[in-house]
Amino acid sequence: MAKKSLIHREKKRQKLEQKYHLIRRSSKKEISKVPSLSDKWKIHGKLQSSPRNSAPTRLHRRCFSTGRPRANYRDFGLSGHILREMVHACLLPGATRSSW
């Protein structure tokens, strides 16, 4: 189980990313449209002044049940060992173990 503080920090990053999403996207479009380098630097400075945690690359996918940040399956939102336990217990409908 992940620490509550780490899960809370991740939720805070998600809120910041949603808040600054439109601002970051519009300023990136402006950079591509502006021909002069000095104007690009000004817009880039505006991007740099936004909070560091508002960048989408700072987000991690976490396991829904344990909060584990590694080995997550996007389709289920679970980490590998929890996914395996749930499939063995038949708690995930439609998931089957492969055998050949």
UniProtKB/Swiss-Prot annotation:
Q: What does this protein do?
A: Binds 16S rRNA, required for the assembly of 30S particles.
Lineage of the species this protein comes from: Eukaryota, Viridiplantae, Streptophyta, Embryophyta, Tracheophyta
Q: Which organism is it from?
A: Carica papaya (Papaya)
Protein name from the UniProt record: Small ribosomal subunit protein uS14c
| Cellular component, GO, one term | chloroplast
Name any Gene Ontology BP term: translation
To which protein family does this belong? Belongs to the universal ribosomal protein uS14 family.
Gene Ontology molecular function terms on file? rRNA binding; structural constituent of ribosome
What is the predominant subcellular site recorded for this chain? plastid
Task: Please give the InterPro entries that the UniProt record associates with this protein.
Answer: Ribosomal_uS14, Ribosomal_uS14_bac/plastid, Ribosomal_uS14_CS
Q: Pfam families annotated for this entry? A: Ribosomal_S14
Binding partners and assembly? Part of the 30S ribosomal subunit.
HAMAP family membership:
Ribosomal_uS14_1
- Alphabetical list of PANTHER family matching this protein: 30S RIBOSOMAL PROTEIN S14, SMALL RIBOSOMAL SUBUNIT PROTEIN US14M
Which domain of life, per UniProt? Answer: Eukaryota
Q: Which compartments does it reside in?
A: Plastid, Chloroplast
Q: Which UniProt keywords apply?
A: Chloroplast, Plastid, Ribonucleoprotein, Ribosomal protein, RNA-binding, rRNA-binding
